[in-house]
Amino acid sequence: MTNPLYDPYQILQKVYGRGSFLKQAIAETFIEEINRARTVKIVYGVLENDIYLDFCIRSFAPKNPKLPVRILLKIALYMLLFMEKQRYMVTDNAVALAKKLGKGGAAGFINAFLRAFDAEKLQLPQDKISALSVKYSYPAFAVSRLVKEYGGEEAEQIMQHRPPRTFVRFASAEAAEPYLQSAEKTPFENVYSFSNFRRDEGFGEGKYTFQ
């Protein structure tokens, strides 16, 4: 039986390490068909909760681990916190995969981190914007804008019940211009998020791709 962290790791390594689009990374990665639904759920879940998972790692790790280990920890934490998998199973598989990937030197750290992690001991930042950003894995710049426009309580309700968003990467600033009226800027160059984006002829012309 394949290690349940292996396929998600292969995909997320391409996203975090190479900057690949998620859909492209999934398409390029051989995934055991029997595990496809689980793998896709994990990779989307990790990316959707990236800010929160990063905060979990920073809160319990004495120093920031290198990217391969950080990806492993994010997958493991997602399985623990959002899929309610058994801690011993997740820990054992994370350690085994680290060794398989040639990261055996980090196996002890991964083991200790996952056994010690306790979500109930997490302390959110005291700053309101930062706290909401972590809690809902929402970019701080977007939280700040929502709070300014709607106030803290209503902004939190919006983040709590936010609809799924589509992330679009444009080939250039000029290509993005016609779409900006309904777009929300992200920290990444020429990448915008939309609550309702419909593909048009611009996709076929290479003006944008989906993240």
Where are these regions (language model features)?
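S-adenosylmethionine
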Residues: 1-211
